[in-house]
Amino acid sequence: LPLAGISLAFTEYRGVKAPEFVGLDNFVRMFEAPGFWTAFLNTLKLSVVKLLLNTLMAVVISLLLNEIKNMAFKKTTQTIIYLPHFMSWVVTVSVFSLILSPSQDGLVNTLLVNAGILEQGQEIYFMGSKDWWTSIFYIINVWKDTGWGTIIFLATLSGISPELYEAATMDG
């Protein structure tokens, strides 16, 4: 199937009719489209920041988990951190949409109104606001994807011999 997709990129696809070979015309049209470079740079920025945040959080959490001596607590914490990885994106976004909803059901806006930070009727539409959207995107991605990286880094840290830690302590 990947080869079929690659070959279709060089054709004018016409549904049930046979595709017509157009060479690089599709790529030229894509690169000349008015919003292409904006979309490309936005995607690149979101991907790089997401990668850095997920890696940083996974390393920090795995270092903290590696220091826990109570195995029952450690395993429970690992499970809780890893669990969001198994949720579908539809469920994840639905849950966050409910939590961040500007209606009376939205937990965050309700807390902000009850704390006196916002007035009733001034609730924030987090998922639809251009000021909040990127932050929410990063929060959701870190919450969902950090568990996987944490497990990988923790497995690596667990493989380090305790004798190396002792030698490092003695060496200073």
Question: What are the residue ranges of the model-derived segments?
Answer:
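A structural signal for multi-pass alpha-helical bundles of membrane permease subunits
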Residues: L1-D171
